[in-house]
A protein has these predicted regions:
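Contiguous beta-strand/loop segments that form the cofactor/metal-binding neighborhood of enzyme cores
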Residues: 165-167, 171-186
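Short helix/strand-capping hinge loops at secondary-structure junctions
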Residues: 98-100, 105-106
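N-terminal glycine-/serine-/threonine-rich beta1-alpha1-beta2 phosphate-ribose binding loop
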Residues: 1-97, 122-123
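Hydrophobic residues in well-ordered beta-strands that form the structural core
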Residues: 65, 103, 128-130
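A contiguous active-site-proximal alpha/beta segment in oxidoreductase catalytic domains
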Residues: 107-166, 176
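A structural signal for well-ordered alpha-helical segments within the folded catalytic domains
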Residues: 6-10, 88, 115, 137, ...
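Active-site phosphate/pyrophosphate- and oxyanion-stabilizing loops and adjacent acidic/basic residues
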Residues: 53, 141, 177-181
Length: 186
């Protein structure tokens, strides 16, 4: 796991590492992490130490000083950094090591970086995925499955707070976009 500055870090780790969690995924476990963090984003700077402590103390996750060391010791990687700007640099050593990769929102800090991440992964034949969990919500999936008939028009609302270092809807806009795309059949 790369970037320990979001509440997704302990949440995903609990799902994977805790057999008592109702959503537990057997066979997968978070075993290593690279702290990361962005000093110029308060939601990163102010939370990274606490989430890092939780991973180490509650889940016994080993911290690595570099991403290159981390990828030598894991089978797959989650990039969880709340700041999309370092995602390309963080993804490069993961892709070079041929490790399957999930990138949490935002996928990158710019369209250029997002396209480069996907290009590198495709070229290296590395599985890469990024998604909003709202795509898999019960109501969204029911509508996609035809519960109300064929969808010909839809509007979506969702959290979409803005962040000064990220353009447009990069920060949270994926939630509404994914819900909309899902019910419209894409």
């Amino acid at each position: 796991m790369i970037g320990l500055d979001t509440s997704h870090v302990p949440a995903f780790t609990d799902i994977l590492n805790n057999p008592q969690n109702k959503a537990h995924v057997p066979g997968a476990k978070v075993v290593g992490a690279f702290k990361g963090g962005s000093a110029d984003i308060a939601s990163s700077r102010d939370r990274v130490d606490g989430f890092t402590r939780t991973l180490v103390e509650k889940f016994n996750v080993k911290l690595y000083d570099t991403i290159e060391e981390l990828v030598k010791n894991v089978d797959a990687v989650f990039i969880e950094s709340v700041d999309g700007r370092p995602h390309l640099a963080q993804a490069k050593p993961v892709i070079a090591a041929r490790k399957p990769l999930f990138i949490d929102k935002p996928v990158a800090g710019t369209l250029k970086d997002a396209l480069e991440i996907f290009r590198l992964a495709k070229e290296a034949k590395v599985p890469l995925w990024s998604s909003s969990s709202l795509r898999y919500g019960k109501a969204v999936q029911a509508v996609r499955g035809g519960s109300i008939g064929k969808v010909t028009y839809a509007e979506a609302t969702s959290p979409a707070s803005l962040e000064e270092h990220h353009p447009d809807l990069y920060w949270y806009g994926v939630h509404g976009c994914e819900s909309l795309f899902t019910v419209m059949g894409t």
